[in-house]
Amino acid sequence: MMDGVFPRDVLIRPVADNDRPTVAWLTTQLWGATEVVVHDDAFHPADLPGFIAERAGRIAGLVTFEVRSGVMEIVTINALNLYQGIGTLLIEAVRAEAKRLGCHEVMLTTTNDNIGALRFYQRRGFRLAALRPGAVDRSRQHKPEIPRTGDFGIPLRDEIDLSCPV
């Protein structure tokens, strides 16, 4: 589903138990804490299943997810270097795992300011599924380190769900 060529030198592998400290560290670096709050739920990505993208023995990306009632929810996804196909490879790994587990849908949540993510996911077959006005404001009560202003100076207030059938 990607325009262009997949990087051939990237290994996608499941998160292993010995990766958990690294996942916790990366989560803190990328998300500001070891905990992520989405749709009023708190998640600890280091405790979740996921996939690591490696290039030349170094981490190039990470995705974590949770499965509930036949829906695989992406909790975090990060490509450490953009526009190199890492995010797409991680999405494809999640889709394959969702299919293997018998899930009928993959979903995720992003924020109203994350224009790049909205473009990325929709180009990969995800559709807008729900809008939660004020959800980030509520999450900030639990996790005050969430900034008030996001990408492009846009006030960070709302959550947007996207979903894709498996």
Question: Where in the sequence are the language-model features?
Answer:
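Conserved N-terminal entry element of GNAT/NAT acetyltransferase domains
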Residues: 1-18, 160, 166
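Acetyl-CoA-dependent GNAT
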Residues: 14-84, 88-92, 157, 165
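Short, P/G- and charge-enriched loop/turn segments at secondary-structure junctions
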Residues: 38-40, 145-153
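Conserved beta-strand-loop-alpha-helix junction that forms the acyl-donor binding cleft
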Residues: 79, 108-117, 129, 133-140
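Conserved GNAT acetyl-CoA-binding A-motif
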Residues: 98-110
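Conserved active-site tyrosine of GNAT-family acetyltransferases
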Residues: 121, 126
